[in-house]
Amino acid sequence: MKKYGYWIALLGLIAFNLYVFFPVSPETALERNIRWAGENGKELERVLEHYRRTGEEQKERCARYLIIHMDRRAAITYEGIVQEKEIITPDLHAIRADFLIENIDLAFEVWKKYPWCSHLTEQEFCRMILPYRMKNEPLEDWRSFYYHRYKGVADSLAAAGATMEEVVFFFNTRYGKRYTHEAEKYRGDLSYKLIEEIGGGTCDHLALNAAQVMRSIGIPLNIDMLPYHGKVNGGHAYNSFTDEKGKFHYFSPYERAPERNRWVAPVVKRIRYESPAYQEVTSSYFPVTDVMLEQPYLSIATYNRGWLNEIKPGVTENGKTTFKDLSRGLLYFPVDSLENPIGIPPFILGEDGVPQFIPAPEPERTVQLRDMHLYDVKRVLTLDTARTYTLRGWDNGWQDIATALPADSLTLHFDCVPDYKLFVIYGSTPYVADMQRPFVMQGDSVVYY
């Protein structure tokens, strides 16, 4: 047994000396991904060999960029009667050399050709023009399809000296697709061919397709996701770009002019080819403030569709939690990692950047809430006069505090109710229950958040 231990120690000493004096170079991300690709690794090597053979060093560098960050890229499709079966196809196992080479060559062609993107650095080009995919859509020839479809138009705009902004909104006005509820039945990120077939899509589909069209002619268009609006329900997807003069623009993908409803969101996340897949860009859109709370390990949530939804975790240091870049003018709920209230009151982050914490309830004090309406965004909803509606107040969670039948088809009255400072009205149907927004009373006025 002692002899066995001696040999183990000796082998360990030999291994240590070999590691110190003859170190083995660690596997690079490029080598790792080619290995992870298995049999398909030869397709990736073909791409690199192609550009070595042609002597195009810059294209080879950019091909390396794509392969290095390819390990987290995949197509996700759905099958089954109700599209219940999710199929994930990693790009490392599926991508072909010819496909990647064509994408790289076409991306370089527009980068070198059109004035609106010639100022981009190689790094900016790699991040905002070069990628062959944006999200988890199928691997397809969208770049070739849209470039050859719109090449003549883009050439004419370039000859006329059009700016990046002019090109974007010319295309949106002339060729923009429509929002269609028909596309809601499809799960996941759609093929560009399906979007062309149905003539449009949801916000997410249209933002993806707009980026495909624009990048095919050298416009570095971003896809920016708003998981939740701040004062209305649901979420959204914007497109954005920074023009030749460094000015930031954002718009809905179906807008025909550079204007939009300025619905503030608590967080905006930009989709990236690199890892991590999302980059927070809220401060590019809205005035923001850092908020510090006197407890550790907190998250911050927003209220959307009847639930508290975590926006992001905070950063804990010295027993305190800091939330970076919170949009001003919105209502926030401090929660734990499971989205449960933790005793810290919600707060409204003022336009001056100062948190205004919701005061504790005063149940012994009563208030009158008269002439109340229910809304779908800004549209007043018709009430069911035979149904009861519930008023809830916040006290480390929503508490039922009163009920009422409608006074008429549009109006509710809640008389002599406990003063809970933060309220929400719940209806008897899921739609009405989920769509109502919290509100506070400011004097005799109702202010919704």
Language-model regions, residue ranges each:
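Secondary-structure boundary elements
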Residues: 29, 35, 42-46, 54-198, ...
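Hydrophobic membrane-insertion alpha-helices, especially the h-region
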Residues: 6-20
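Short amphipathic beta-strand segments in non-cytosolic proteins
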Residues: 296-315, 388-403
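Compositionally biased low-complexity segments at domain edges in trafficked proteins
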Residues: 358-398, 448-449
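Structured interaction patches on ligand/partner-binding surfaces of diverse proteins
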Residues: 338-364, 428-449
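A short, amphipathic beta-strand motif
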Residues: 283-293, 300-302, 310-313, 333, ...
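Short Pro-Gly-centered beta-turn/loop motif in secreted/extracellular proteins
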Residues: 320-339, 409-429
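Hydrophobic/aromatic-rich core segments of domains that either
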Residues: 26-31, 158-169, 173, 182-193, ...
